[in-house]
């Protein structure tokens, strides 16, 4: 099944723009820029939206205007409006359980403690969507997680995250064609 919607999870606003938690939005923004596509704010949809077309595979890109914990509402509104099934959605998000700079593509599963994924799963009524997980590393203790995800990465970590984003963008044409298994083999290796 081809991907028709890519969602970059984030917290909106300049205070959060450069935080680890916004790594998903970094990838989706970079993807739009590489295809000379510009986001437009749609307040009714609670989102910034744009479209790209790669090899005759059109896809909408979404950056929610809601905070991370309410990403599901925007994702549901957009998917219902455009008649996009959960299996046609790719959620791009930060991942504590991957080392900084790793990136993995996954289909389905639980939320793994990620509140954005938790809300999307609740709003869509299923976890059977695709996820592109960008490793941001773990602070070592669960009590430090909140502060960690809302902090800016070091220059070294930021570069590793950008390198992972480049690898993620490289598989998007494969993902849009619907060959998820091939994309997984390429990026998860």
From Swiss-Prot:
Range of residues in the leader sequence: none
**Record has tRNA-binding as a keyword:** yes
- State its location(s): Cytoplasm
- Which residues are noted in the entry as tRNA-binding? 16, 67, 69, 115
Q: Which GO terms describe its molecular function?
A: peptidyl-tRNA hydrolase activity; tRNA binding
Q: Which Pfam families match?
A: Pept_tRNA_hydro
Set out the biological process GO terms recorded for this chain's protein: protein quality control for misfolded or incompletely synthesized proteins; rescue of stalled ribosome
Q: Which GO terms describe its cellular component?
A: cytoplasm
Which positions does the site annotation Discriminates between blocked and unblocked aminoacyl-tRNA cover? Answer: 11
On subunit structure and binding partners, the annotation says:
Monomer.
| Record's protein name | Peptidyl-tRNA hydrolase
Organism encoding this protein: Legionella pneumophila (strain Lens)
């Amino acid at each position: 099944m081809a991907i028709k919607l890519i969602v970059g999870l984030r917290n909106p606003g300049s205070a959060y723009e450069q935080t680890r938690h916004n790594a998903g939005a970094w990838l989706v923004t970079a993807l739009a820029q590489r295809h000379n596509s510009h986001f437009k704010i749609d307040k009714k949809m609670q989102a910034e939206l744009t479209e790209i077309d790669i090899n005759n595979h059109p896809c909408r890109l979404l950056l929610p205007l809601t905070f991370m914990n309410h990403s599901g509402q925007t994702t549901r509104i957009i998917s219902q409006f455009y008649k996009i099934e959960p299996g046609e959605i790719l959620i791009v998000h930060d991942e504590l359980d991957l080392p900084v700079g790793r990136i993995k593509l996954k289909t389905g599963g639980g939320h793994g403690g990620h509140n954005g994924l938790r809300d999307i799963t609740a709003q869509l009524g299923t976890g059977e969507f695709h996820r592109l997980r960008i490793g941001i590393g773990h602070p070592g203790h669960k009590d430090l997680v909140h502060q960690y995800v809302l902090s800016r990465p070091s220059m070294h970590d930021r570069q590793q995250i950008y390198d992972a984003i480049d690898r993620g963008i490289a598989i998007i044409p494969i993902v849009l064609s619907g060959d998820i298994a091939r994309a997984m083999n390429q990026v998860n290796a």
